[in-house]
Design a protein with these regions (language model features):
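Membrane-embedded transmembrane alpha-helical bundles that form the catalytic cores
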Residues: 1-468
Length: 469
């Protein structure tokens, strides 16, 4: 089920919310779990068995881990941990990477391996990382293993976060798995955040996506320098509003049910360094890699050479997590190298650069970094980057670039304003306390919702970009 289908915000979510608070407390988690499994199975019911088996495997493995650790059998516990992690990773590796790997082996070794093109289960990358988080937190004593199977299954499959995160850590959500009471202010706050996220996705990302895909269809060879930069800028803003919009919808929906999730974005395009950008962008994924990969490898505590290796490995894995294509590998290594340069080579020089210039430089580096991310092949990425820095047949600026600049500048201005914290501050001042302000705020959110409905009915938006990961 897609979160931008009319069925989700106007039927599925309201019915689930109503049932959750109408049912007795002892039935609420079971009802929410049933709704989450239905959400997962919608459209691809054949994959439900994979999720159920993963939940059962990790539930019993977690109980066994805790029991072995209490008995002091650390070696046996480590064996259970490793075997369960391998079992968790198998579906992810098969559905996301087998096709690319088989095709590569066929090319290199002239083999005839079958290249399957099976669609991946909904949110397989996200719920796999959720399961690994639970195992690690139990093994390292960060949280006790949840003894109630329904509550544990709900942690894994809770539908607001299932499709594209945020990746909620087990230690953060486990204390919240008790049924929640209805709190009007909390539900209202969640609804407002949900509408804001829906508007980001349907309105802003949709309006930015139309010219971007038009420029991408033209191809880098047909673009001018201005057109290539405009396309990269449109994608940078579109991806931000697409993914942060989904995150707001997920966090808002979870809040309606009483769950408090941490923010997943913190105005990343205001960052004054690449490291700061990644502390603000997809924060739940960054926290996951830092907590479960980077720090266990030694982090930055083991000398310069080891730290460089750790950074490169983590960013290689981050790229591969997004996909097996070479473009994602290059994208991950690009950020690994930038972070190494910032940390070990350019730190003192950058400290002397004014903050505003550091922000501009960081933003330009990030925009450049999105080119391999949205490109279908390395050749396309290289051609697009070449066009950004050297004029081809279309020159510095051409009719296509001027047309899309002329038709998109209003939405670009709105998008830039909304991507900066000033937009939030303006909203907070505008909707300050008071009856009149409350009425204006209500009308504002109703208007946003109506615009979203219009966009959803007309289909003037693209599917969630991060749903493919």
């Amino acid at each position: 089920m897609k979160l931008t289908e009319l069925l989700y915000p106007f039927a599925f979510l309201p019915v689930c919310l109503l049932l959750y608070y109408v049912l007795p407390k002892r039935c609420r988690n079971a009802a929410l779990l049933a709704a989450s499994l239905l959400f997962f199975a919608w459209g691809t019911p054949e994959y439900l068995v994979l999720l159920v088996l993963a939940i059962l495997l990790n539930y019993f493995a977690g109980l066994e881990l805790e029991s072995l650790l209490e008995d002091g059998k650390t070696g046996h516990a480590r064996l259970v941990l490793v075997l369960t992690i391998l079992a968790d990773l198998l579906p992810l590796l098969f559905f996301k990477y087998y096709g690319e790997a088989a095709a590569a082996l066929n090319r290199v070794f002239v083999l005839s391996l079958p290249v399957h093109a099976l669609p991946a289960p909904v949110g397989v990358s996200f719920y796999t990382f959720t399961l690994l988080s639970a195992l690690s937190d139990v093994y390292h004593g960060r949280a006790p293993m949840e003894k109630n199977l329904i509550r544990f299954a709900l942690f894994v499959s809770f539908f607001p976060k299932l499709t594209s995160g945020p990746i909620v850590q087990y230690a953060d959500m486990q204390p919240q798995l008790e049924p929640h009471e209805f709190v009007r202010e909390r539900v209202g706050s969640g609804m407002r955040l949900f509408v804001i996220g829906l508007a980001k996705k349907v309105i802003l990302a949709g309006l930015l996506g139309t010219p971007f895909y038009a420029l991408k269809v033209l191809g880098p060879q047909a673009l001018s320098v201005c057109g290539a930069w405009l396309g990269a800028l449109l994608y940078a803003l579109m991806l931000y509003f697409d993914f942060s919009g989904y995150s707001d919808m997920a966090i808002g929906a979870a809040k309606m049910f009483g769950f408090e999730f941490l923010a997943n974005f913190d105005y990343p395009y205001c960052a004054d360094s690449v490291a700061a950008f990644w502390r603000r962008w997809h924060m739940s994924l960054g926290f996951w890699f830092r907590t479960y990969i980077y720090i266990p490898l030694g982090g930055s505590r083991c000398g310069t050479a080891r730290t460089i290796c750790n950074l490169l490995l983590v960013w290689l894995l981050t790229g591969i997590w997004h996909g097996a294509a070479a473009t994602f590998v290059v994208w991950g290594l690009y950020y690994g190298l930038l972070l190494i340069l910032e940390k070990f080579v350019l730190r003192d020089a950058l400290a002397r650069v004014p903050a505003i210039l550091r922000r501009v430089l960081t933003f330009l580096l990030v925009v450049i970094g999105w080119v391999p991310f949205f490109s279908d092949t390395l050749g396309q990425a290289g051609a697009w980057l070449a066009r950004m820095f050297s004029a081809g047949q279309a020159g510095f600026v051409d009719a296509a670039a001027l047309y899309y600049l002329r038709t998109t500048w209003p939405v670009l201005l709105i998008a830039v304003f909304a991507a900066l914290p000033y937009g939030c501050r303006f909203g907070n001042r505008f909707f300050r306390a008071g009856r009149t302000a409350s009425m204006v705020s209500s009308l504002y959110f109703i208007g946003l919702l109506l615009l979203c409905i219009a966009g959803m009915v007309n289909g003037t938006y693209v599917s969630f970009l991060y749903a493919q990961f």
